[in-house]
Amino acid sequence: MAVDWAGYGYAALVASGGVIGYVKAGSVPSLAAGLVFGGLAGFGAYQTSQDPGNIWVSLAASGTLAAIMGKRFYNSRKITPAGLIAGASVLMLAKLGAGMLQKPQKS
């Protein structure tokens, strides 16, 4: 059973981004979205750590954030926060996709 450190790091990045948005701009929607999506990503990382084939919560959270923040980045061209989160989400999608393509390992 391998721990999904990348998934936990991604969850921490998303949640801390929401907190930073609240502290800097007083944005309650940023705080709520950051904590909800960070929590979902953290839960997905926990599930992936328990069963490497169970990637669906992580896939949904990172895919949704990649789409939403990618659209925001396309419209605003601002690296932070939209570009950073969109990029991290695309990297998580690539990691999850690569994990799906690997053969299962016998333990």
From Swiss-Prot:
Bilayer topology term: Multi-pass membrane protein
Pfam families, alphabetized: Tmemb_14
Main localisation: membrane
InterPro entries xref list: TMEM14, TMEM14_sf
GO-annotated biological processes: heme biosynthetic process; regulation of heme biosynthetic process
Keywords: Heme biosynthesis, Membrane, Transmembrane, Transmembrane helix
Key word Transmembrane helix present: yes
Cellular component terms (Gene Ontology): mitochondrial membrane
Transmembrane portions of the chain: 3-23, 25-45, 52-69, 81-101
Phenotype upon gene inactivation: Morpholino knockdown of the protein results in profound anemia without affecting erythroid specification.
UniProt subcellular location: Membrane
Annotated function: Required for normal heme biosynthesis.
PANTHER family: TRANSMEMBRANE PROTEIN 14, 15 (PTHR12668), TRANSMEMBRANE PROTEIN 14C-RELATED (PTHR12668:SF4)
Similarity-based family: Belongs to the TMEM14 family.
Protein name per Swiss-Prot or TrEMBL: Transmembrane protein 14C
Organism: Danio rerio
